[in-house]
């Protein structure tokens, strides 16, 4: 006699095997993350601790910032812009402010900076000084930089005429 009942489907259960993290995959992921972090910190966003008071009050001694290093591969420096300069090797940098460009003249009289004979408005300079620097022209390939804390003796500042090739980047904050 024919069976008129519909065929019954076989009940089968599919059990997924538990995924076990392979330690090698985890190690590779951690290694890739570490390598990318190191490369970003060395060549793009470098963390920096500020040492010294030449940029006070804009940047305080023992302060922290990130330097955006590829900035000058994209943009040209601007007057009054704070820049990061290469100094004495791979791990030492300076923060200074760009004040004059090639072909311009600079002079400091009684602490007042003149560019091309005109007083430069510097609202970021909070500590006055009595420096004097005779009129001079910024040579080709150089820029004139100074720190914001002018109350420090001029001999203690690592600024003045510097090669544009020393521009390393800009602080982010």
Region roles according to the model:
Residues 1-173:
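Extended hydrophobic leader/signal-anchor segments used for secretion and membrane insertion
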């Amino acid at each position: 006699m024919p069976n008129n009942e519909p065929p019954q489907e076989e009940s089968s259960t599919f059990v997924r095997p538990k995924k076990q993290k392979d330690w090698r995959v985890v190690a590779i992921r951690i290694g890739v993350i570490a390598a990318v972090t190191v490369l970003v910190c060395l060549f793009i966003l470098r963390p920096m601790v500020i040492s010294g008071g030449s940029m006070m009050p804009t940047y305080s001694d023992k302060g922290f910032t990130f330097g955006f290093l590829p900035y000058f591969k994209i943009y040209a420096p601007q007057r009054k812009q704070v820049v990061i300069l290469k100094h004495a090797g791979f791990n030492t940098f300076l923060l200074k402010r760009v004040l004059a460009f090639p072909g311009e003249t600079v002079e400091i009289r009684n602490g007042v900076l003149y560019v091309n004979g005109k007083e430069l408005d510097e609202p970021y300079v909070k500590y006055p000084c009595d420096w004097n620097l005779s009129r001079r022209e910024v040579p080709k390939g150089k820029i004139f930089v100074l720190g914001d804390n002018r109350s420090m003796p001029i001999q203690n500042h690592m600024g003045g005429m510097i090669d544009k090739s020393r521009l390393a980047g800009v602080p982010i904050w």
